[in-house]
Design a protein with these regions (language model features):
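Basic, Lys/Arg-enriched alpha-helical interface segments
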Residues: 1-63, 72-76, 85-109
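Residue-level signal for short, function-critical loop segments
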Residues: 82
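Hydrophobic/aromatic beta-strand elements that line small-molecule binding cavities or substrate pockets
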Residues: 66-67
């Protein structure tokens, strides 16, 4: 099984550009797993709400999250990402991702 990974807007590219090469590599490894594996454990993927998921990556003591949705069953659309600094995913980041999701579906009409 292979999913096509696409991005929407510049949110994800801007996030990746803010990271060092090793952190980018780790996130890309997570994306490769997401693209090629039929199921991933909650260590890597967590359902947030309303069809929104987060890809979970750790590198060098830092925790990174990238929001995505499934579109048409096999397309993964990457939204914003952030470096996590607390146990709980901040509501502000979730709300930002939900706004981007609405923007994405609005652009498909």
């Amino acid at each position: 099984m292979e999913r096509k990974i696409t991005t929407f807007g510049t949110y994800f590219r801007e996030f990746m550009a803010s990271l060092d090469d090793k952190a980018q590599f780790k996130i890309n490894q997570g994306l490769l797993l997401l693209a090629t594996q039929p199921r991933l454990s909650t260590k890597f993927v967590k359902s947030i709400c309303d069809g929104l998921f987060e890809l979970r990556t750790e590198w060098n003591g830092n925790i990174y999250r990238v929001f995505f949705i499934f579109d048409n069953g096999n397309i993964v659309v990457l939204f914003n990402g952030f470096q996590k600094k607390s146990q709980k995913t901040p509501n502000s980041e979730i709300n930002k991702a939900l706004k981007i999701k609405a923007e994405y579906y609005g652009s498909k009409k």
